A protein has these predicted regions:
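N-terminal lobe/hinge region of extracytoplasmic solute-binding protein
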Residues: 25-75, 106, 185
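Gly/Pro-rich hinge or "lid" segments in bacterial periplasmic/extracellular proteins
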Residues: 136-139, 148, 153-221, 227-229, ...
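Surface-exposed binding/hinge segments that line
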Residues: 83, 100-109, 113-174
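Extracytoplasmic/peripheral linker and loop segments enriched in polar/acidic and small residues
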Residues: 142-143, 303, 336, 387-400, ...
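Structural transition elements
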Residues: 312-349, 367-371
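Ligand/substrate-recognition segments at binding pockets and active sites
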Residues: 340, 346-418, 433, 486
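Alpha-helical secondary-structure segments
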Residues: 97-104, 147-153, 188-189, 216-219, ...
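Long beta-strand-rich cores associated with HINT superfamily self-processing modules
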Residues: 488-517
Length: 517
């Protein structure tokens, strides 16, 4: 009898029925799996699972070697030379070469690509000129010295450059990527096994990955779930091992009844409402934008509406970035009653001669938490200023596209998670030439301060960036609401999870405790 059971176990295991599988919530459907078009967190998370750059992140969120085995920094920080791993291969067995990086970067910086995050490569020599069509992409400062050696030249010293190399925009591309990106070979710890939109993205272990022997999971199943309440229900039903987030207002309940599986950690990220300053009624109307900002009680939003340890935001850049003191907008030093009085004064001046109540559209992507925030903000605007608000809810891809085009948007859900630990990760979003500038804010002085900061170092550089943030907050193209914390539910059977301020948890470091069949 024991022999029969043993034989049955061996057969079942060989068929993959006891394969080590992790089930994860993803949040919204990825906006794109093209490394040069993806900009949402779900897409970036998936791309980091199936692809890898010269650098990557370890379980604690630290930058470590990825496809590169080693590197040296020369020319006082302006030249990087990388040696690729000898066992770096694509999932089809092809050798991964330095030319695969050159090909990818030239595509990222070609004007025709319209890469959404190409600005991250701006420190690279001729990168900005290439995106503007002033030079050919082949003139960009990246070249293959040999099949396994790569050289990158920068315009200026960029302390966070190694972090940028771990972003999808800096990943390599197989030659087949140019025609069939979803079917092309990948170089990450996993590869796509099954993709069913709005239902399941199934990843399987990539045996060609350079560190495949250290990856304990055989399969990772990601479930796109926009509604955090639905995600919570599926976690409680045993369908998920790890959630992407928790529902708004449920932190205290979860802490009381599910505290052993609740993981809350600091996070370098800001949540705000963006204002399309290129559309009426916000064009050349700073007083109206400031009035709307001052009328919002951020403490209520952070503590009661969201309620998971978030901090009220008075700035765009969050705390926690070494050497930088976030600036606060005018009026943040007042108590809420005084802020509301100032909001009324500014609103009256902004609406002088107009008797009809103002109607504003507030657009957000599908999420019960985003809806609660939108309802709370619209209630505050109504109570303090008499402003009416029309709430518009959209599926993630539609929302991202409308926000990018700026034809329909007035006020919209916004925010940013740091791509690297520097103020420019947030402030660069508002440069007039940024592809991610969804507020359509344009200020030559702001752009000049950002340009000047590029060639500065130390305290002088940080002071320039602080002046830029101060100017940005005076112009108020966004309404800061709160600073993020990461929030997950994690089954005790999941191993290898380490909280970190980047909230990056690659499945290659995770595992699932084996179950006895």
């Amino acid at each position: 009898m024991k022999i029969t059971k043993l034989i049955l176990f061996i057969v079942l295991f060989s068929q993959g029925l006891f394969a080590s599988t992790l089930h994860r919530g993803l949040g919204p459907e990825p906006d794109s799996l093209d490394i040069h078009q993806a900009q949402g967190l779900p897409a970036i998370q998936l791309l980091r699972e199936i692809r890898e750059g010269l650098t990557t992140f370890d379980a604690a969120g630290n930058v470590v070697a990825g496809t590169a085995a080693s590197w040296e920094i020369l020319d006082d920080g302006k030249t990087y030379r990388f040696e690729l791993r000898k066992n770096a291969r694509w999932s089809n067995g092809d050798a991964l070469t330095a030319d695969d990086f050159v090909r990818a970067w030239q595509r990222a910086l070609a004007p025709i690509t319209l890469a959404r995050t190409a600005g991250l490569l701006a420190p690279v020599m001729n990168a900005r000129e290439a995106t503007e069509g002033l030079v050919k992409p082949s003139a960009v400062g990246i070249k293959a010295l040999s099949a396994t050696s790569l050289e990158i030249k920068l315009n200026v010293v960029t302390p966070w450059f190694l972090e940028v190399l771990a972003h999808p925009v800096a990943f390599p591309l197989h030659v087949e990527d140019m025609a069939h990106p979803l079917e092309a070979p990948v170089n990450g710890a996993f590869m796509i096994d099954n993709l069913t939109f709005h239902a399941l993205i199934r990843l399987k272990k990539n045996p060609q990955f350079h560190a495949a022997e250290s990856v304990s999971l055989d399969v990772v199943e990601y479930f796109p779930i926009e509604d955090p309440n639905s995600e919570l229900s599926r976690f409680r039903a045993g369908e998920l091992d790890m959630t992407e987030t928790i529902p708004a207002g449920r932190h205290d309940w979860l802490q009381t009844y599910m505290g052993d599986v609740l993981k809350v950690s600091p996070y370098i990220g800001s949540f705000w409402l963006g204002i399309n300053v290129g559309r009426k009624p916000f064009v050349d109307n700073v007083k109206l934008r400031r009035a709307l900002s001052l009328a919002v009680d951020r403490r209520i939003i952070a503590r009661l509406v969201v309620g998971a340890g978030e901090l009220p935001a008075w700035s765009i850049v969050p705390p926690g970035i070494a050497g930088y003191s976030p600036q606060a907008f005018d009026g943040s030093e007042l108590d809420q009653e005084a802020r509301e009085q100032e909001a009324k004064r500014l609103y009256t001046e902004a609406r002088q001669g107009k008797n009809k109540p103002l109607l504003i559209e507030l657009r957000y992507n599908t999420s019960s938490q985003h809806r609660k925030i939108a309802l709370a903000v619209s209630s505050m605007w109504r109570q303090v200023l008499g402003v009416d608000t029309e709430l518009v809810n959209e599926e993630w891809k539609v929302f991202v596209n409308n926000r990018r085009q700026g034809v329909l948007t007035q006020v919209f859900r916004g925010g940013w998670i740091a791509d690297y630990a520097d103020p420019t990760s947030f402030l660069d979003l508002f440069r007039s030439d940024s592809d991610l500038n969804t507020t359509f804010y344009k200020n030559e002085v702001f752009d000049r301060l950002m340009d000047q900061a590029i060639v500065l170092k130390g305290d002088e550089r940080m002071q320039h960036l602080q002046r830029a943030e101060t100017l940005l907050l005076k112009d108020m193209p966004v309404i800061p609401l709160y600073f993020y914390v990461s929030r997950h539910l994690l089954k005790p059977t999941v191993t290898g999870y380490e909280p970190n301020v980047r909230d990056i948890h690659l499945s290659r470091y995770l595992g699932v405790k084996s179950k006895t069949p």
